[in-house]
């Protein structure tokens, strides 16, 4: 075995050769540079931002959002798009389901004029477009809706009864192998929306599984399970859903936390409703009977009136949000004036 000085010298020579061949910083000691805090894209619900542990969806990572039909998956993704745009970023939406409603997206705060939209013919085309956009280094957020709709070309060109076992899983595996490094280098967040299926013959455990094979489960830094738990009513009319999101995988913070929030029909996630729930939970808002009070000021009787008060008094809502985030240590509040630094080119 070589002596310690010789080993050190050999290592330095090897590192110099690697830097020369592959560029400076290809290999570095973990202690050489202080890692920057993970930058995030807020989800639109402070309860979900808290459950994620870092204040939102991490940039430069793969995110999977899955759940039953009409549970709020696309709504959560569109709120992330709106927040990315609000911070000065560019977002893209790969609409493989051909079901994006521009009017609904606009109501959630999405700038539909600047949103890049693609409605691809095949799964290969969708993922190739996504990969090219990511490698441009100019995109902050890309949404693929949904994995189940990424139909391989061979299946589209084949007959209706043909068997194409494992084609979609292989397609997803190859795409994620290519995209993951590029996402990290460009700081682009990729949200894959996925559907649920049931495995036949499962005796123990949940029979539910997601489409597209196992690759997405491995490559995802965050996986969100979105469920509708109750219908919100105004008298006899249904006005929205109470939604529960479980963080079933989290590589950037402790997993298995849950968040509950309201999704109102035609309006999306109720930010004010989330602030009331979290404010009461953290002790900033006092609930006495049906009355909600903040620092001696009555917000209203009943949650709906308190929600309307915060809608009309944005300064109070921002103050409550800031206090909650400071107490829980999940970063500063994102304002319209803040601009996220441009992704690093590569």
Swiss-Prot record:
Protein residues bound to ATP: 67-74
Cellular location(s): Cytoplasm
CDD domains reported for this sequence: RecA
Keyword Transport: no
Annotated GO CC locations: cytosol
Pfam families from the UniProt entry: RecA, RecA_C
Homology family: Belongs to the RecA family.
Keyword Endoplasmic reticulum: no
Summary of the function given for this chain in its UniProt record: Can catalyze the hydrolysis of ATP in the presence of single-stranded DNA, the ATP-dependent uptake of single-stranded DNA by duplex DNA, and the ATP-dependent hybridization of homologous single-stranded DNAs. It interacts with LexA causing its activation and leading to its autocatalytic cleavage.
Top-level taxonomic group: Bacteria
SMART domains documented for this protein: AAA (SM00382)
Cleaved signal peptide residues: none
Keyword tags: ATP-binding, Cytoplasm, DNA damage, DNA recombination, DNA repair, DNA-binding, Nucleotide-binding, SOS response
Protein name stated in the entry: Protein RecA
UniProt-recorded Gene Ontology molecular function terms: ATP binding; ATP hydrolysis activity; ATP-dependent DNA damage sensor activity; damaged DNA binding; single-stranded DNA binding
A single BP term in Gene Ontology: DNA repair
């Amino acid at each position: 075995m070589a002596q310690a000085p010789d080993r050190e010298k050999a290592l330095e020579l090897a590192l110099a050769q690697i830097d020369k061949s592959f560029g400076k910083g290809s290999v570095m000691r973990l202690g050489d540079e202080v890692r920057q805090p993970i930058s995030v894209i807020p989800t639109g619900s402070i309860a979900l931002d808290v459950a994620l542990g870092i204040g939102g969806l991490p940039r430069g990572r793969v995110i999977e959002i899955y759940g039953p039909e009409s549970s709020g998956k696309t709504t959560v993704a569109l709120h992330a798009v709106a927040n990315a745009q609000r911070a000065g970023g560019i977002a893209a939406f790969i609409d493989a389901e051909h079901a994006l409603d521009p009017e609904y997206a606009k109501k959630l705060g999405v700038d539909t004029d600047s949103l890049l939209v693609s409605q691809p013919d095949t799964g290969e085309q969708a993922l190739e477009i996504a990969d090219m956009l990511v490698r441009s280094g100019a995109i902050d957020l890309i949404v693929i809706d949904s994995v189940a709709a990424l139909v391989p070309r061979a299946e589209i060109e084949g007959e209706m009864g043909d068997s194409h076992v494992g084609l979609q899983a292989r397609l997803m595996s190859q795409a994620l192998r290519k995209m993951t490094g590029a996402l990290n280098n460009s700081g682009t967040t990729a949200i894959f929306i996925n559907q649920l299926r049931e495995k036949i013959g499962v005796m123990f455990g949940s029979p539910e599984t997601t489409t597209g094979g196992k690759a997405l489960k491995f490559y995802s830094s965050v996986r969100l399970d979105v469920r509708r738990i109750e219908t919100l009513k105004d008298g006899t009319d249904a006005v929205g859903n109470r939604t529960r999101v479980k963080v079933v995988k989290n590589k950037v913070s402790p997993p298995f936390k849950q968040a509950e929030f309201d999704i109102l029909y035609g309006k999306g996630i109720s930010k004010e409703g989330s602030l009331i729930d979290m404010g009461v939970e953290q002790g900033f808002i006092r609930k006495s009977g049906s009355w909600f009070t903040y620092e001696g000021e009555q917000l209203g009787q009943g949650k709906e009136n308190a929600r309307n008060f915060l809608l009309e008094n944005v300064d109070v809502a921002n103050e409550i949000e800031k206090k909650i985030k400071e107490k829980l240590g999940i970063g500063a509040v994102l304002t319209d004036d803040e601009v996220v630094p441009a992704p690093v080119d590569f």
